[in-house]
Amino acid sequence: MDKKKLFQYTLDGKFTDLELTLVDSNDTLTMHLHKVILSSSCPYFETMFSNSFSDSVSDKFRMEVINVYVMADIINSFYITDIERSQNLSEVDYQLLYTQSRNFLGLEHKIQNLEKIIFPENKFDKLLDTIDSCIGYNKETISILFYNMPMDYDLSKLPIKLLKKMSKISRYFILCIDSDRIELHNNHSCFSIGPVKLNYNCKLYKLLYSPIYHKYLMVNDTIHLIDTETDLSRISFDNNRYYCTNAVLSTDNRYVYSVYTNSTIRKFQTETTELIGVWYRDGMPIDTVNKNQGPITAFDDRPKKIMYSTPYDYIIVQYGTSLVCYKCLDMSIHWEMDNVHLPTLSQCEKYIVCLKGITGNQLCVIDIEKDSLKFGPILANCRYICNHDNTTVIIIHDYKISGSKIRVYDWVNNIFTYENESFNVSDITYIDHIENDNYIIVSHDIIDDSYISINKWNFKEDTTKLVTACYDNYSHKFYTITNFKAALQKRIKEYIDTNSN
């Protein structure tokens, strides 16, 4: 059966056996259709044309619907897949009506259509009503609700049972680039944020999220900004000769500081992406018009990491094995330090925990304000140092023969408080702390190196739970953690604690 030819017959009014008139509160639309196509594609029409109802259905039928044009699109999709929308609605309004209309017809729901949309605050109640009346609450729909819920939403509108499920299901998100788009994953949904401009010659990307301005930023040879409320994007710094190796937001989210392959530091406004200033490694300013000038930096001395210290308004940049601390006020150098490896900013942002020495094997704590050192134990085969809480870090050792060891180090009291030797870290490409004893790890499959898995890992229980997985077809992909719903999570938890019996 050639459905495309049959669809053309519906347009021409030829060889059809049903005249279906769709009626809503504003419009009426008549379609000439084939009963066999409708009944084979849709439970609603299959029941209508069954023996028990066939006597009441003639060759003409009037059907009251929510929106005649959206319903017509769904019916036309029974014939062809590449249909053009018959009404000029916003994507938000269209998908809500589309979901409601499919539910009316008894068709399966296409939840992925809702995941692709950022719902504005004034549409959240409609989203909630649509999910409540049409789909129901499951892990995917609760995740969609949490993702789109306004920060100041009246939580009393939602039952405690639903809020408890919401607090359990959506604790963290992973931001990544996939097929020229920015996507946000949690363990139940994949939300499409928007398209990005990729330079495939550039292997270095940094993804940031500003919870204050509700914007995503992708920093490479350009600055690509996406507004989550309007879904509009802006690109700055075109034709930049050098690539960003790392970037960080100031605590107030007003500025982004980024470091580039020519060892320059750049500062720009988050809200407008306007370039504020460019500085050499020694803190000397560069004319922003000539921002691409600068010395060619040896690969081993290029900037690797940039950290922001909130209490002191400093940025600390790692160049090769050197650390340089700058005052954000005037970008003057506060201190410099050599032979530093694996620097990690403490949770209180007043200290840096790292490895020190020419061989890079002695644990050391740097007081950022006082430029003082506190030395700890000698370590062997240290692979990662990860911030854990205000006084401890996770240290991961990689032993080629005997496997791996996880240790928790209390740098205030200079003692190890925990050890675990069962986890294999040899294939980890990224690790970051989420909460309590839980971390996110990104790793390549041992057999198929192109296969990437992102897992939630509890280091004390030595358990992992898959969050998402994909094939890394391009080396430019980068993953990071963004807990941009932390404030809402806190509100929900406080509301549950206050209102639970």
From Swiss-Prot:
Residues in BTB domain copies: 16-87
InterPro entries in alphabetical order: BTB/POZ_dom, SKP1/BTB/POZ_sf
Pfam families: BTB
Family as reported in the entry's similarity comment: Belongs to the mimivirus BTB/WD family.
Descriptive protein name: Putative BTB/POZ domain-containing protein L107
Species lineage: Viruses, Varidnaviria, Bamfordvirae, Nucleocytoviricota, Megaviricetes
